[in-house]
Regions:
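Glycine- and charged-residue-rich phosphate/anionic-cofactor binding loop of Rossmann-like
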Residues: 28-30, 282-295
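Internal alpha/beta domain cores that form substrate/cofactor-binding pockets in large enzymes
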Residues: 2-4, 31-34, 44-47, 52-56, ...
Length: 348
């Protein structure tokens, strides 16, 4: 299939590498890119998607541009008759989510969201364990994200650190939130309740750099995700599945899963673009359909509107540290508790 890429810099560079690989494997033809800057790619570059489509006629468009541009680009791709793989967050409001979903159905097209950890073997194995009852009744899903980030992190793009487009739950730890919602089986529900505690330790940003969210729904285990970019030491993001018969610990970035401290064998990962192409060719189910990002989009939209108070923190060179947060985010995931319930000085 003929594939075009919108946004070839930053994370988009990974898509360039993947498209070149798929071309060598004979699975896709990488026809061109759209980018506002000059980019070093082995295919023609265009200033906008219609111009590219007029000459190159893509069948699939991969979108890896700033989040605020996603809605318009997805709709443009649909108008051109293309299926879409769009990076997370796919969209920033439920209104946009519903509009894109309806347009896809109307045109007979598909939209895959860029939650690549849904394609990992560890995710599929964990879903199987939960479904089989191996962990017993699931009593809660916790996730913790703890990274060290310097000032340069917020200088990488104009939208970085901007509320409504960035934030720990919406961007760097979006996978933690999405994975927890999936494992709680609430990803498509419209009746979730969301409790947010968002904070920022830098006065140069408007989005949160430290956050906790609890998501609940009738008949589903509670979800708590706690995150920070103001840690003293980084920790690979982790999802904890608490059950009456045991606990699963999933390090999704490493495709690693343990159950009651035993390492589980997992199948190879599935590439999202390969999956989308096979969906079109053979009917293989999509790994990360947009429909499965409804609850995530609801939380993301609320993050864009919530208060984000400034916390006192320590500056150490080009880093900002929030004392105590390293332990707090882990405890929140372990206890399925919010910052406030843990008695943090900065909890509400």
């Amino acid at each position: 299939m003929r594939v075009a890429l919108v946004g070839a810099r930053g994370h988009g560079a990974r898509h360039v590498e993947n498209l070149v690989r798929l071309g060598h494997d004979g699975l896709a033809t990488f026809v061109g890119v759209v980018d506002v800057a000059d980019v070093d790619v082995p295919v023609p570059s265009y200033p906008d998607l219609p111009s590219l489509a007029d000459e190159l006629h893509p069948e699939v468009v991969v979108i890896s541009s700033p989040p605020a541009t996603h809605r318009d680009l997805v709709l443009t791709a649909f108008e051109l008759g293309c299926d879409v793989l769009v990076e997370k967050p796919a969209v920033l409001s439920l209104t946009d989510f519903d509009e894109i979903s309806a347009e896809a159905v109307k045109r007979g097209l598909v939209c895959q969201a860029g939650f690549q950890t849904q394609g990992t073997g560890s995710y599929r194995r964990l879903c199987s364990l939960i479904g089989s009852g191996a962990l017993g009744e699931i009593t809660g899903i916790g996730a913790a994200g703890r990274w060290v980030r310097t000032d340069s992190y917020y200088e990488r793009a104009e939208w970085a650190g901007r509320q409504g487009e960035d934030g720990t739950l919406v961007n760097p730890f979006a996978h933690a939130l999405q994975n927890a919602l999936l494992l709680a089986d609430v990803e498509e529900r419209t009746d979730i309740a969301v409790e947010l505690e968002l904070y920022r330790c830098r006065d140069t940003i408007t989005a949160d750099d430290t956050a906790c969210v609890r998501v609940t729904a009738d008949g589903a285990p509670p979800v708590v995700v706690a995150t920070t970019l103001c840690a003293t030491t980084s920790l690979p993001p982790v999802v904890l599945v608490h059950g009456t018969l045991g606990q699963a610990v999933w390090w999704y970035d490493d495709d690693r899963l343990t159950v009651n401290d035993h390492r589980m064998a997992v199948a190879p990962s599935v590439d999202l673009l390969e999956n989308l192409i096979r969906h079109r060719q053979t009917g293989e189910p999509l790994v990360a359909p947009l429909a499965a990002a409804r609850a995530f989009t609801s939380v993301a939209e609320q993050c864009g509107k919530a208060d984000v108070p400034l916390l006192p923190a320590r500056r150490v060179g080009d880093r900002v540290l929030l004392d105590g947060i390293d332990e707090v985010v882990v405890r929140a995931a372990e206890k399925i508790a919010t910052f406030t319930e843990l008695g943090c000085g900065f909890g509400r």
